[in-house]
Regions:
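General detector of N-terminal leader/presequence modules that precede the first folded domain
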Residues: 46-48, 54, 59-73, 120-125, ...
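Low-complexity, highly charged intrinsically disordered N-terminal segments
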Residues: 48-53, 57-70, 74-81, 86-94, ...
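Short glycine-rich His-centered loop
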Residues: 18, 22-33, 41-56
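Short boundary motifs at domain starts and secondary-structure transition points
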Residues: 33-43, 106-108, 204
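Glycine-rich beta-alpha loop elements in corrinoid/cobalamin-binding modules
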Residues: 85-211
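Helix-enriched interaction subdomains in cytosolic or periplasmic regions
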Residues: 1-25, 75
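ER/secretory pathway lumenal C-terminal domains and tails of membrane proteins involved
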Residues: 8-11, 32-37, 70
Length: 211
């Protein structure tokens, strides 16, 4: 959430690739599926990561994730990539080699994006969310985050009672996310174009006022 457009971060696949031979089901980390979307970084004013806090095999079939992925990428001025929880074998290797949580499409660090949207379908995803934030290098507590960190928001069934994770998120979206994701993208874009008035707290106040 820096005041200037984020510089394009480098992908991590060259560092990640040697580790994949040492893990189970490495194909889940490669990406490149049919209909995957990867827009040039400079073509987007708002960069999203849509994360399902479980493994690829559990999260990829989720219809809500697929819908939001399509909606955001159809905006033209915003883009969305996906991220999933990694299995313990790869997590251990990533931590040992200093590699952070990454996106599936470009393998860029999750922390380099503007918005991290997490779909919490069950309470079991809450601990995976915290683990992913830690692996990404994003401060766990929302009041410790700076302009260099993404906005962390949750949606899905568990968002109707956000209190268990209230200290760790910036925004909870209640109900269907199709319209909300567009409005959130517009707010973040307009706030940035205006020079980021009020800093991180400024955009959070605008988001809170939307109800």
């Amino acid at each position: 959430m820096s005041e200037q457009p984020r510089p394009e971060p480098a992908g991590l696949f060259d560092e990640l690739s040697p580790l994949l031979a040492q893990v189970v089901t490495p194909v889940q980390y490669v990406g490149g599926e049919i209909n995957a979307r990867l827009r040039p970084w400079g073509d987007s004013q708002v960069h999203w990561v849509l994360m399902y806090p479980d493994t690829y095999g559990v999260g990829q079939p989720n219809q809500g994730l697929a819908i939001l992925y399509e909606v955001i990428n159809e905006l033209g001025w915003a883009s969305a990539e996906r991220s999933f929880s990694v299995w313990p074998d790869l997590e251990a290797l990533m931590r040992a080699h200093g590699l952070p949580q990454f996106t599936l499409e470009s393998h860029r660090p999750v922390r380099a994006y503007d918005v991290l949207g997490v779909g919490l379908s069950t309470e079991l995803g809450c601990t995976n969310l915290l683990n992913a934030l830690d692996l990404a290098g994003v401060p766990l507590h929302s009041d410790e985050r700076t302009m260099d960190d993404p906005l962390v928001l949750i949606g899905g069934h568990c968002a109707f009672n956000p209190e268990p994770v209230a200290d760790f998120i910036d925004v909870a979206v209640l109900g269907d996310g199709e319209e909300a994701s567009v409005e959130l993208s517009r707010i973040v874009r307009d706030w940035r174009l205006a020079g980021c008035p009020g800093g991180r707290d400024g955009v959070l106040e605008v988001l809170a006022a939307t109800g």
